Amino acid sequence: MIPFPTERLDAILARHDIVTAQLASGEIDPETVVQLSRELSDLDPVVAAIRAYRAALENLAGVEALIDEPGTDPEMRALAAEEKPEALAALETAHRALQLLLLPKDAADEKSAILEVRAGTGGDEAALFAGDLFRMYAKYAESKGWRVEVISESEGTVGGFREVVAEVKGRGVFARLKFESGAHRVQRVPDTETQGRIHTSAATVAVLPEAEEVDIHVNDADLKIDTMRAQGAGGQHVNKTESAIRITHLPTGIVVFVQEERSQHKNRARAMALLRARLYEAERNAKDSARAADRKAQVGSGDRSERIRTYNFPQGRVTDHRINLTLYKLEEVMAGTALDEVVDALITEHQAELLAAEGMA
């Protein structure tokens, strides 16, 4: 158990006192009140954990003093020896809780997310699998009380999706879904297979934190906006008004296209939200690139070409290759009810990587 630097803990406690005093003074403007209130809500659980950790340290030190002190009554020494394992366990629990709270925070974790699922290799079967994955996430979102709104979709010829993009709205969505980015592989016998042969196909998933205007500034002069009639399967026009929107961000070449709504205004708003999310992701990736070069994380690398998970239907098996996790709960995972088991394991591994990087493991 690596002890925490006293100076770091004292600095957090001192900052908590300063923020509390500033808020109590009544001498700050409303905008600063909002900022400090948000900071205080972040500091409160850390301060509580520091106090619990120090209390556990003090308790263990008292127990050990009774055991080691030559003049201690034998009966008291025996009682202290019995209490020591419990005191040590309490300290380990408090230490672990504080460890996790001191980890670097991903500013995007509390945000909603943009979910993109695209069929990969495998033709019609890949499109069907992309549809299965999207339904898995939709059911998972429903179980969490999140709201899913489709931004754009392109259906496969026999079902499923060649591509589907959706907003998943709710608090903490990105924290739970961000490790889903990557290549997902399926092994199963397609309905059209007469010989009973297992086929392998794939779909890619990208999860982007939803960006607000305060997160990323988009200059109107950098945009090329085209309007056109919405199109259905096969390219035929499905309405007579030019409600579909395509926005090109000229400096980066990023293009977004939205046609789901009948209203051009709504499609434009959704297209701008999608563009901001992609620009925000690019900015985050640029900031993270130097750190990624120093330490290649197995979890959370976000590489869309990386094969992260296999869904084997004949065996009823789901395997996440980043952490060597295998669950024989394929139906439950695809129904969204057991996806938490995979997500929780990925988060735990990511926390372990962060602890090691911070020298706290």
Swiss-Prot record:
Gene name of the record: prfA
UniProt entry tagged with the keyword Cytoplasm: yes
Modifications after synthesis and translation: Methylated by PrmC. Methylation increases the termination efficiency of RF1.
Biased composition (Basic and acidic residues): 285-309
Family: Belongs to the prokaryotic/mitochondrial release factor family.
Record PTM N5-methylglutamine, positions in chain: 236
GO MF, one annotated term: translation release factor activity, codon specific
Gene3D superfamilies: 3.30.160.20, 3.30.70.1660, 6.10.140.1950
Function recorded in the entry: Peptide chain release factor 1 directs the termination of translation in response to the peptide chain termination codons UAG and UAA.
Protein name: Peptide chain release factor 1
Organism expressing this protein natively: Methylobacterium radiotolerans (strain ATCC 27329 / DSM 1819 / JCM 2831 / NBRC 15690 / NCIMB 10815 / 0-1)
Subcellular location(s) of the protein: Cytoplasm
A cellular component annotation (GO) from this entry: cytoplasm
SUPFAM superfamilies, A to Z: Release factor
Chain positions covered by the region annotation Disordered: 285-312
Principal location class: cytoplasm
UniProt cross-references to PANTHER family, sorted A to Z: LD18447P (PTHR43804:SF7)
Keywords of the record: Cytoplasm, Methylation, Protein biosynthesis
